[in-house]
Amino acid sequence: MGLNTAAVKSAQKTIVSLGGNAIVRKGQAGTVSEQFENAAGACQSISSIISSGCSIIITHGNGPAVGNLFIQNEAAAAEVPPMPLYICDADSEGSLGLIIQQSLYNRLRAVHIEREIVTVLTQVVVDPSDKAFEDPMKPIGPFYDEQAALILSRDRGWVMKEDARRGFRRVVASPRPVKVVEAGVIKRLSEQGVVVIAAGGGGVPVIESAEGLLSGVDAVVDKDFATALLGSVVEAETIINLTGVDMVYKSFGSASQRGIREMSVREARQYLEKGEFEPGSM
């Protein structure tokens, strides 16, 4: 994940967004030691950005972490009450935040940079009338056979969809974020020079009542949408995505794939309309 910092030196407010594969890479088991090792590698690039004088906020995906928590929930359901998905979202945001925070702290000490770092557990408001709730598409958790899927659908109200090769999985909504609850304090901390880790895994999805009260909802917010919304609110000038690939590709994964180093907004929209970028991809 090498990074040329020349493009960001003039930007005073920068968001660095870590993809889920920056913490747990393809083919790995996802052990804590692997996650720390991967985070340490990502933090080398992040420390270069910090040394260039940028004020940064870090967001990150929760990759397989929240799914693994969900699997642990189900495996121990006979022993302890399983937690709802939004609590699993919060758990993964906290644990991955710690891994990134500690790794960056150690990296900055190694290169003699003094900056405070904090992880902010972030709630993200979603609209209960979002069409994503009518047609859940985001798969989470383990695979089940057809009989188990029918029982879970009946007893817990889960929406189950079949993967033709591996069985049935629960699918949940992935609504668009409309407000970042902690955006104000995130902005203030960043302006004071604190490196803030926020909106991990897209944040914890919540619904806001007419009285302004919040309640969690079982959903998964796309990390990139949450990052873009947060960037707008804190007035970030640059968003940098650190991922497992070196750039955006047209016809990705095919023999004719072609790298795209720069594109206009118009070109990006045209690529989207042509289906070049799969849902959930970078």
Enumerate the predicted regions with their spans.
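A glycine- and small-aliphatic-rich helix-loop capping segment at beta-alpha/alpha-beta transitions
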Residues: 32-35, 71-81, 134-142, 211-219, ...
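Polyanion-binding loop/helix "lid" in catalytic or ligand-binding cores
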Residues: 37-49, 85-103, 107-108, 173-190, ...
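Short, active-site-adjacent cap segments at secondary-structure transitions
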Residues: 22-24, 63-67, 125-128, 204-206, ...
